[in-house]
């Protein structure tokens, strides 16, 4: 309980934040269209968030930085932000404070990063190839990832690293280089133990989905289904003293199985390692795991830029 709790206050804060960021977005677009003489034809704001705007300065670079090195272009953009954009934003905030009858302006926006490439997959899902961070020039570009599977704990660790490597290739190399990388990783992936490629999850609602006759009920989440199958098989094999049952709230891993396996189920979960007594290693569905853990997350990115993860045969190539 909080003395000053009031939904109206929360709503007012949220609405004010949305209004402020949209106000700055409109003002920045207006300013850049005027300076670059695009007469309101271009939207220079790629995206905005609660307290951030992402500004595309490609037209400015094209007009003023022909023949310049990447280092010189970055220096130029930094100077533009410091001497033009930030003072303009400060002026706009003062105007907004006056408009809203604020006691004084308390809003400030500073440049965070300069990136030479960026890809937006969806709202709040993007990646930036950062070359300058808060005025500090980076010796090597640094990936800033938001909402991408490479930073999600639900993705296997090995795939998180490889997704980051693939994004680096997308940011700096050619599509054919990505094809080679994916093909090589697929070979490596099929040699990895099941524990390395399984999905990590937290297991909840075991009692809700358990069925004494059929192990699990229809509609059971796949990782819970795998956990119930695991507990059933531990009991069937008499392994209770060697392997603990999966309990409510346990951190587990689950992995897909090919259909032709002794358990007749398409998934199995476990706590730390797959019991050798189950003799399921040869039935691990590496193809599906590769699709779900690596290719599916990559497809969102590749669709946004029109790339493929492997070479596509064309009619021209077929007929030589």
Roles of regions detected by a PLM:
Residues 1-3:
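Active-site cores of enzymes that catalyze phosphoryl transfer or operate on phosphate-rich substrates
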Residues 6, 14-48, 57-320:
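DNA-dependent DNA polymerase catalytic subunits
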């Amino acid at each position: 309980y909080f003395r000053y709790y009031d939904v109206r206050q929360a709503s007012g804060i949220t609405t004010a934040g949305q209004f402020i960021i949209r106000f700055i977005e409109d003002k920045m677009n207006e300013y850049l269209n005027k300076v670059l003489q695009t007469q309101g034809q271009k939207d220079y704001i790629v995206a905005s968030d609660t307290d951030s705007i992402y500004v595309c300065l490609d037209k400015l670079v094209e007009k003023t930085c022909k023949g310049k090195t990447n280092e010189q272009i970055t220096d130029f953009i930094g100077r533009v932000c410091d001497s033009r954009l930030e003072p303009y934003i400060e002026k706009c905030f003062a105007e907004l404070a006056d408009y809203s009858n604020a006691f004084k302006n308390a809003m400030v926006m500073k440049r965070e990063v300069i990136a030479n490439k960026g890809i937006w997959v969806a709202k709040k899902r993007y990646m930036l190839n950062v070359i300058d961070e808060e005025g500090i020039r980076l010796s090597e570009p640094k990936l800033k990832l938001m909402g991408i599977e490479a930073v999600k704990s639900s993705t296997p660790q090995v795939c998180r690293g490889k997704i980051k490597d693939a994004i680096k290739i997308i940011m700096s190399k050619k599509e054919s280089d990505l094809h080679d990388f994916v093909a090589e990783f697929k070979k490596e992936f099929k040699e990895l133990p099941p524990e390395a490629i399984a999905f990590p999850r937290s297991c909840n609602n075991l009692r809700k989905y358990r069925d004494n006759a059929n192990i699990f009920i229809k509609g059971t989440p796949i990782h819970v289904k795998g956990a119930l199958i695991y507990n059933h098989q531990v009991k069937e094999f008499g392994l209770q003293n060697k392997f603990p049952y999966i309990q409510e709230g346990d951190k587990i891993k689950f992995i897909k199985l090919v259909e032709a396996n002794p358990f007749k189920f398409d998934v199995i979960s476990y706590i730390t390692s797959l019991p050798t007594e189950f003799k399921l290693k040869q039935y691990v569905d590496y193809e599906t795991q590769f699709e779900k853990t690596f290719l599916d997350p990559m497809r969102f990115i590749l669709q946004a830029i029109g790339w493929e993860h492997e070479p596509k045969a064309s009619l021209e190539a077929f007929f030589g």
